[in-house]
Design a protein with these regions (language model features):
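Amphipathic alpha-helical repeat elements characteristic of tetratricopeptide repeat
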Residues: 36-37
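Charged interaction scaffolds used for protein-protein
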Residues: 2-7, 15-16, 23-33, 49-91
Length: 91
């Protein structure tokens, strides 16, 4: 995902990555209700777990006219295509 002209790569969304997101406060049942926290968590995952740095980058991104919906769409695509969620859907 591109934030402030920097490209961040969300790591493979494995079981362990999902646990890290939960440890950072990203609750998959509340993803639609807590969009900003979810986006910050995924960006932090791409930034070695630094929630404060991720929040600062997102704030700068929005202040400079960046679009949060594009980031949300990209995260949704990554989640849907992850092997972890594919396995869950097939159960």
């Amino acid at each position: 995902m591109k934030i402030n002209n920097k490209e961040y790569t969300i790591p493979e969304l494995s079981f362990n990555a999902m646990c890290k997101l939960e440890d950072m406060g990203v609750n998959f049942a509340d993803m639609e209700k807590k969009t900003l926290s979810t986006v910050r968590g995924f960006l932090a995952l791409a930034m070695d777990g630094n929630l404060d740095k991720a929040g600062t980058e997102l704030e700068k991104h929005l202040a400079s006219g960046g679009n949060i919906e594009e980031v949300v769409t990209e995260i949704g695509k990554e989640v849907e295509e992850s092997g972890f969620f594919q396995a869950l859907k097939s159960q």
